[in-house]
Design a protein with these regions (language model features):
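Short, small-residue-biased leader/transition segments that mark boundaries at the very start
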Residues: 1-7
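Nucleotide/pyrophosphate-binding catalytic subdomain
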Residues: 8-14, 18-21, 70-80
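N-terminal hydrophobic or amphipathic helices/low-complexity stretches enriched
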Residues: 19-35
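N-terminal capping segment at the start of a domain
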Residues: 32-48, 196-198
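Cofactor-binding active-site loop characterized by glycine-rich and histidine/acidic residues
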Residues: 39-42, 54-178, 184-185
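Glycine-rich beta-alpha junction loops
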Residues: 90-91, 95, 198-199, 233, ...
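Thiamine diphosphate
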Residues: 131, 135-138, 143-246
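Glycine/aspartate-rich loop-and-adjacent alpha/beta segment that forms the canonical ThDP
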Residues: 234-282
Length: 282
């Protein structure tokens, strides 16, 4: 697969529509499937990486870049672009695939994932990868960077919005909640965070390691508007993001229930695929 996989503006950003028709949903599903294929390709070629969480978040990445965010792949550093921070940075393979599909770089770069000197590293690198707005990897830190971007927009009277995706295991980190307090205190209504709730982390289930529920009430108590969705349902993703635009004076948390390893039958809901690359037979 080469440049023919690049789909730059096939789905236009439209904040005024009244829902997607079946053809739009089908196109998003096709793009998300290609993103999952890219994540598998990249981790296979690298012989390392994190396919499970990459697959669970692929639908969210796809919707954001092809339907929600105002970005320009030909000008990745455009000052007025919407920003995206992948706080769970280890799940970048499917994000890289979405960026390739959007036209930030060639699809073949995925075959060099994690190679020394390659454009695409094991965690997002804002200096080396077009389309990456923040270098991440140490869990819990991305939301702080997203808060800074959102506050900068407010101070500069800019209209861009900031989006971030966190893992559910990641919200066990204390820094997440410090940043959440900051976001609410500063009334960052231009900030939307997704929590990818696939229920698994490297050491087992999230409930076993350090239960985080009731997560909705926790974010609400910190001053967030909260929406709960199926993270694989594009209609629900769209509805939550449309509602998020109507929220004033507070940040938004979208709690997205997902399946770790989504789309690959033997990977789904299996903690072992958190950080294991597939082999040729698989």
């Amino acid at each position: 697969m080469g440049s023919e996989m690049c789909i730059r503006d096939s789905i236009k950003v439209n904040q005024e529509d009244n829902g997607m028709d079946s053809s739009e949903i089908k196109q998003l599903q096709i793009l998300a499937t290609k993103a999952r294929m890219g994540a598998i390709l990249g981790t296979f070629c690298a012989k390392s990486g994190h396919p499970g969480g990459s697959l669970s978040a692929a639908d969210i990445f796809t919707y954001l870049y092809f339907k929600e965010m105002n970005v320009d792949p030909k000008n990745p550093k455009w000052e007025d672009r919407d920003r995206f921070v992948l706080s769970k940075g280890h799940c970048c393979p499917s994000l890289y695939a979405v960026l390739a599909l959007k036209g930030y770089f060639e699809w073949d770069e995925l075959t060099k994932l994690r190679h020394v000197g390659a454009m695409l590293q094991g965690h997002p690198d804002m200096k080396g990868t077009p389309g990456i707005d923040m270098s991440t990897g140490s869990l819990g830190q991305g939301i702080s960077a997203a808060c800074g971007m959102a506050l900068s927009a407010k101070i500069s009277n800019k209209s861009y919005r900031v989006y971030s995706v966190l893992g559910d295991g990641e919200v066990e980190e204390g820094q997440v909640w410090e940043a959440a307090m900051f976001a609410a205190h500063n009334k960052l209504d231009n900030l939307v965070i997704f929590v990818d709730q696939n229920g698994l982390q490297i050491d087992g289930t999230v409930d076993e390691v350090a239960g985080i529920e009731p997560l909705d009430k926790k974010f609400e108590s910190f001053g967030f508007e909260v929406f709960k969705i199926d993270g694989h349902d594009f209609n629900q993703i769209e509805d939550a993001l449309n509602k998020a635009r109507e929220v004033k004076g507070k940040p938004v948390a979208i709690l997205a229930k997902t399946v770790k390893g989504k789309g690959v039958s033997f990977m789904e809901n299996q903690v072992g695929w958190h950080g294991t690359a597939p082999n040729k037979e698989q």
